[in-house]
Curated annotation (Swiss-Prot):
One of its GO terms (biological process) is glycine decarboxylation via glycine cleavage system. The keyword Glycoprotein does not apply. GO terms for molecular function: aminomethyltransferase activity; transaminase activity. This is Probable aminomethyltransferase.
Amino acid sequence: MAKRVHLFDWHKEHAKKIEEFAGWEMPIWYSSIKEEHLAVRNAVGLFDVSHMGEIYFRGKDALKFLQYVTTNDISKPPAISGIYTLVLNERGAIKDETLIFNMGNNEYLMICDSDAFEKLYAWFTYLKKTIEQFTKLDLEIELKTYDIAMFAVQGPKARDLARDLFGIDINEMWWFQARWVELDGIKMLLSRSGYTGENGFEVYIEDANPYHPDESKRGEPEKALHVWERILEEGKKYGIKPAGLGARDTLRLEAGYTLYGNETKELQLLSTDIDEVTPLQANLEFAIYWDKDFIGKDALLKQKERGLGRKLVHFKMVDKGIPREGYKVYANGELIGEVTSGTLSPLLNVGIGIAFVKEEYAKPGIEIEVEIRGARKKAITVTPPFYDPKKYGLFRET
C-alpha cells in the first residue's frame, strides 16, 4: 500500500490529480501544472512536501559519524542552519542528496528524498551496528519521516507572507539558515530553503499522522492542517496557489536542479551503459569537502584520474519538441547520451532538459540533437538556470 502524508484527505478533496510518486500518494496538481508553476514564478505557491524524509542524529559523536558518511563539511554550519551534502556508497555513487541542519546540543536533522529515506536509515543503522569504528559511538539515529509535516512556500511573495505570518524577514536569513517560529501557538522549524529556484521558506511541524505505519501513533493532524489553511488564507492577497508535484518538477527543471532517481542514483541503468552516478558526473563537486575522509572518497579520486566518461549537461530545444526521460541524444550523427529529465517549460514555452552525455560534450554552446518520436530535433547545451536570473529566481532584480 502506498504511503500517505498527514494531509492526504485534504489533498484528495482539493487536488484534480493524485498519483503515486516514490511510493507515496501525492497531489500532482490542483488547477493545472502551468497555473501553479507560474504562480510560483510570479507570486507564491504552497507545496506539501511531507513525503520528504527526516532522520535525527543525536549524541556527542553525531558530528563525527556524519562527517564520515557524507561528503560536505558538516562542522561548518552554526546552529541553527544547514548545509547541502551527499551520501555516497563505497564506489562513489550517490545514495542521495541531503540537507543537514545543525540543531545545536549535538543534534542534527537530515532531510532526504522521499524514496531514499528508508534506505538511508537502514544504511546508517547498519554502519553503526557493524562497523568497528562506529559501534561504540555516543549516537542515536531516529527516523521521523512519518511524524513531521513539511510545507514549502515558494515565490517572490514568500517574503511578504513570512512577514505576515511569523513577523520575520527571510531575506535577513542566509540560505539554509533556520529558526524556531510560532503560528497561533503552534511551534515549528522554519528554514530559508526550497527546490524551485525562487526565494522561499519551508516549515517542519511535528504532528499526528492518520496514516502513520505505526497504528499506535495515528491521529488527526490538527496542527499541520491549521498551519496549511492559515498559509493559504493569509496568502490570498498575494495570489497564492496550492501546488502539486507536477509544478515542483517543472520548476526545479527550469532552475536546473537534479532529481534523485533521474540525475542522481545508485545503479542508474541507462542505454548508454551508465550504471551509477557520482558527484563528479552530476556537477555536484561543490558539495564535496576534500580535506576529510568520507565513504566513497577513494573511488572519486580514482575516477578523477581515469576520466568521468559521462557527465550531466543542460540543454534547450531549438526545434519544436518536448524532450522526455530516456530519449537519445546525438552530436554529429553519433549517439552521445540520453535525456534524464525533460519538459516543456511553462515559463519559456520551449522544450528544456538535462542529459547524460559523453564528457567532451558536457559544456554550454554545443549543438546536439534529441530523438523525439523517431525524428532528431536540434537543441543546444546551456548553462542553468533556463530563465533570465535577472527577471526570475532567487536573485531577480525586478
